[in-house]
Amino acid sequence: MTKSLTFILLSFHTLCCMGGNTITTAKQPTLDDLDKVISASKEYTKKYEQEVGYIKSKYVHAKSAQDKLSASRELFTKYKSFKLDSAYAYAERKLHYARILHNYEDSVYSELDIADIFNKTGIYVESYKILSGLEHKPMSADMRRYYFSLYGNLYEGLRETSITAYQRTENERRRIMFRDSLKNMKNKQSDWDKAEFLCSQNKYTDALHCLSNSFKNLSYEDRDMGYVAFSISDIYRQINETDKEKQYLIISAIADLKN
């Protein structure tokens, strides 16, 4: 469910050209709202750069491995949605300091974060090396959810790049296996996980209901707003509700610009 602002804006332009006006009720954003945010984008970019600069200063001046780990964690979070090369660099650094500190949780999360970046950039062999080298039994419930989700994403990527029908079938079988492992976990799943599973079953109405639970609790200042709105838009795309697809693309674009 990762996306770039450029993709959102290009997609939205295409939709507008395809026909129809956007919905303009009081609670729904319009193109004018998006234009206002775009005009103020320099302000948001400046704020983001200031925050990153401040954390980088903390990292440079940190004296202890614990402080280096903390700053690396913050910088990874800042970069993971926008600059994967920088996110990768700080994921490696937080893994380095976590190992020095014998911090199991940060070590595992760092390896999972690196595998996630490899998945997103199509480096599936390296992602598999990391995931297959991890033992999931000692993991916390959140770690296991992340782990199973990454394995599912890995095999989805391999399925899409398969050359033969046999490879496609086998990768799809493995994707479903990890999807089911995620679904069958006894611990409560997030609305995001539930929606992704429901979409894989073509249960789009149920998926929208799950995501609406998260959406109604978010504002434009929440980083997750962009992801949730984009996911809702993508569901509407799949069921050919173009007006609502456009509406949530605008919301996603505004949230991304503000964060």
Residue ranges and their predicted role:
Residues M1-T2:
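N-terminal secretory signal peptides that target proteins for export/translocation
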Residues C16-N259:
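A "functional boundary" signal
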Residues T6-C16:
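Bacterial N-terminal signal peptides
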